[in-house]
Amino acid sequence: MVSSNFYKNLGPRKLTAIIDFLHDIIEPPKIHEDIAIHDIKILQEASPNDISFLSNPKYSEFLKTTKAAACIVPKNFTGEANPNTVLIHAENSYFAYGKLIDFFYTPIKSYPAKIMKSAIVADSATIGKNCYIGHNVVIEDDVIIGDNSIIEAGSFIGRGVTIGRNARIEQHVSINYTIIGDEVVILAGAKIGQDGFGFSTEKGVHHKIFHIGIVKIGNNVEIGSNITIDRGSLQDTIIEDLCRIDNLVQIGHGVKIGKGSIIVAQAGIAGSSTIGKYCALGGQVGIAGHLNIGDGTQVAAQGGVAQNIEAGKIVGGSPAVPIMDWHRQSIIMKQLVKTSNSKLKK
């Protein structure tokens, strides 16, 4: 249930207003009554004054019994539904749901154009128009922050860092040696631009390699909580436009992540590896160093990648192999365990 402590409901909204708002991404349905829609809820909890959505076919059974006045469904949905529920077909029902959230809700917390008194901002820093700088933020010399950006409480922005327009930096984020584009979101606790894990071993002693690269983050990127992104040793660490990186991900020095890639929680990418455009790495995936992962590659959760992967491949397992081979290996392993157990019983 949505808490009114944190989010303001902008409803009720007329069903026709909802259809008009989504008109470019849905097939407008025929409606017999223009009712008021009060809220968005899951199918199981929706009332006759609510709208719902279906994006995962696992939940299609609930459409038969839902009380929702309307439901956004995939374009090709032809299953059974409550006859009293208006079905709104969308090319991407989950995307339409996301747009609908924006139509119904807004955060109660606001960020006025203000620098809080407890913030420490260097005289040589440049703060754009309409920015919010929160309590106990530290902004060092020669930092540039673009217009309409938000830096929340306790964050540290190191000397020379550039942050573009419309950025949102949440609480207790640390950023050093980094250039960031526009429309970037960095969630709480992220650490960006620190030294990478680089040492040379001489006569049993591990000597630190001074890192002289930086981190470059493109436009419209989202970076999760407690992520760590190391700056390059010599080559820069680069995250291109439109990437989405989940919580607790480690990105090593000199890594390049291509445009539009998605990296799920607890994945780790070792130094100097290149991830192509529009790749997807599942949770806890590990990528060894100095590898090239081709555009459009998908790696299943907990996959361990130790060699280059051609573009468009889907792999899984550790060491990672083509996904069908991984499924076969899993089946064979189960059969071996059954055979072994039956022999032990004899």
From Swiss-Prot:
InterPro entries: Hexapep, Hexapep_transf_CS, LpxD, Trimer_LpxA-like_sf, UDP_GlcNAc_AcTrfase_non-rep. Keywords: Acyltransferase, Lipid A biosynthesis, Lipid biosynthesis, Lipid metabolism, Repeat, Transferase. GO terms for biological process: lipid A biosynthetic process. Pathway: Bacterial outer membrane biogenesis; LPS lipid A biosynthesis. It catalyses: a UDP-3-O-[(3R)-3-hydroxyacyl]-alpha-D-glucosamine + a (3R)-hydroxyacyl-[ACP] = a UDP-2-N,3-O-bis[(3R)-3-hydroxyacyl]-alpha-D-glucosamine + holo-[ACP] + H(+). Its EC number is 2.3.1.191. SUPFAM superfamilies: Trimeric LpxA-like enzymes. GO terms for molecular function: N-acyltransferase activity. NCBIfam families: lipid_A_lpxD (TIGR01853), PRK00892.1 (NF002060). Homotrimer. This is UDP-3-O-acylglucosamine N-acyltransferase. The gene is lpxD.
